[in-house]
């Protein structure tokens, strides 16, 4: 049933993304004021739905398309490569270093910013220049749905946004119900190899691991992406090690764990890879990453 619902969701998403990317569906010219509260608690108010949007993170570009507002994007940052139409957008720098002049020249009536990715000073400068800023920070799987709904509200594409968000949440809930009684698999998620970096329980990826019946061995850390040492990992002895790296290719450093043959994850060959675009971007494509992690943790259970 999960695969069936997931397939239908993908069909819906592809339909929306294609329609919005090619601008085949004309949006109603509404002039009513719109307002949402962003992830920092600030109220973002527009006199009418946005018609020119700049997104300052790749995942916000994706979420705009998922919300039915892809055709309203006039600017994006480097690595905004999904869906295909996003590759044609004017680039205003990288998410860590944006070109303020380029953004202003695009005359956006809405800028989508990323709290933990864009510098605070950069966002505040754009705000001081009179631009409307919506700040996003998805820390949980449910937050992705809020992001899509908020963008839909600000762009006047609520119907598409609601369908996408609701379908996404339905699948999340189905996965939760499927694995809620499963035996926990202690898991280590590797963000990077040097220094050795992982995630705490406050990270959205930890949320995804828990959804699949995994237990993040560093869930109790205060920092959201703590640096840890090898001795600590060995002591906590995870059953599974999951990594994604920086590209769609499996990172070579995942195999370096084979030198630590005292680890259960190594003994059982539970060294798993997930495409970073499917787990590190806070979009509906998290469902692909979740599906893969759930499959991997099921394999780890079977190898006990």
Tell me the role of every PLM-derived stretch.
Residues 2-6, 19-59, 158-188, 237-240, ...:
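Bacterial Sec-exported substrate-binding components of ABC uptake systems
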Residues 7-16:
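Bacterial N-terminal signal peptides
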Residues 37-41, 90-101, 221-230:
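Short helix-initiation/N-cap motifs at beta->coil->alpha
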Residues 42-43, 109-110, 120-197, 218-220, ...:
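Extracytoplasmic substrate-binding proteins
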Residues 52-106, 110-115, 217:
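A short, structured surface patch at a secondary-structure boundary
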Residues 57, 115-116, 191, 221, ...:
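Short secondary-structure boundary segments
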Residues 77, 202-225, 273:
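His/Asp/Glu-enriched short active-site or ligand-binding loop at hydrolase and phosphoryl-transfer sites
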Residues 100-107, 129, 228-237:
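Short helices/loops that flank or line small-molecule/ion binding pockets
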